[in-house]
Amino acid sequence: MSKNILVLGGSGALGAEVVKFFKSKSWNTISIDFRENPNADHSFTIKDSGEEEIKSVIEKINSKSIKVDTFVCAAGGWSGGNASSDEFLKSVKGMIDMNLYSAFASAHIGAKLLNQGGLFVLTGASAALNRTSGMIAYGATKAATHHIIKDLASENGGLPAGSTSLGILPVTLDTPTNRKYMSDANFDDWTPLSEVAEKLFEWSTNSDSRPTNGSLVKFETKSKVTTWTNL
């Protein structure tokens, strides 16, 4: 019987790559996003990550008798600015919606749909391990995401028994958007999306390879060599 992976943000750059990779390994792929992913076996579109939409998509997946072996939240965004920026509060609201609420929505979906012993992964940020004065809203929401990861690893965090809650903390991902806005950067120091998908597949298929429940896993690429560090 094939296993199931659910990706929130399955139409974005990272999410679509994860769907593509797992599908190539004969996994049943499920995408939830604001737009359809035609490559996924099941693609659910939502208008927002509010309570009604999330409850509705959970019901739709349950109606297909699908239980999830791996859940990955690849949804999110970035915004710069410090407290003096004219659009600071606008960026705060945007980052809460894109980063923090998507993490909370993921936690609820995972609690309802993940199999016992399953893998649950949120996308944090290496930058949020330190001060982020030039991008306060982004750093704060990613730091809060790290907190959620650890809470879900607790016995009473709400995930099914035996589950592993992890955070992946990239430095810079090699995405079309990053290439567009940082065209002068050294792309050899950016992590290919395929490497992230491959690592998630390793953790999904070999539970012994997983970091300790609640771990934040930082990864950084230098000269096309990626180092993964469990924090």
Swiss-Prot record:
NADP(+) binds at residues 6-30. The active site is at 138 (proton acceptor). Gene3D superfamilies: NAD(P)-binding Rossmann-like Domain. SUPFAM superfamilies: NAD(P)-binding Rossmann-fold domains. GO terms for biological process: L-phenylalanine catabolic process; response to oxidative stress; tetrahydrobiopterin biosynthetic process. It is an enzyme of class 1 (oxidoreductase). Its EC number is 1.5.1.34. The keyword Chaperone does not apply. One of its GO terms (molecular function) is NADH binding. The keyword Oxidoreductase applies. Coiled coil: none annotated. It catalyses: 5,6,7,8-tetrahydropteridine + NAD(+) = 6,7-dihydropteridine + NADH + H(+); 5,6,7,8-tetrahydropteridine + NADP(+) = 6,7-dihydropteridine + NADPH + H(+). InterPro entries: NAD(P)-bd_dom_sf (IPR036291), Sc_DH/Rdtase_CS (IPR020904), SDR_fam (IPR002347). The product of this enzyme, tetrahydrobiopterin (BH-4), is an essential cofactor for phenylalanine, tyrosine, and tryptophan hydroxylases. Homodimer. This is Dihydropteridine reductase. It comes from Dictyostelium discoideum (Social amoeba). The gene is qdpr.
